[in-house]
Amino acid sequence: MYEVLIERTAERDLRSLSSPLFLRVIPHIRALAENPRPGGCHKLVGSKNDWRIRIGDYRVIYEIDDRQKLVKVFRVRHRREVYR
């Protein structure tokens, strides 16, 4: 089982979400502790350990450290904003 760490930038992103969207995203983030590479996740091009999961029009960007069993969530943003 992995530890999930939510970085400050992701905390800010989560606070800005509407309540229904927040309630939709949080279970996906928690599930990363069990399986950091769920079906439908994609490795980001040009990075070693960065991944993304898609939740509707939103993306969760995170890094996996297999040695430390750690998942760091960096961003939770709309798809048109997340890669800027």
Predicted features along the sequence, with ranges:
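Basic, Lys/Arg-enriched alpha-helical interface segments
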Residues: M1-I55, D66-K72, E81-R84
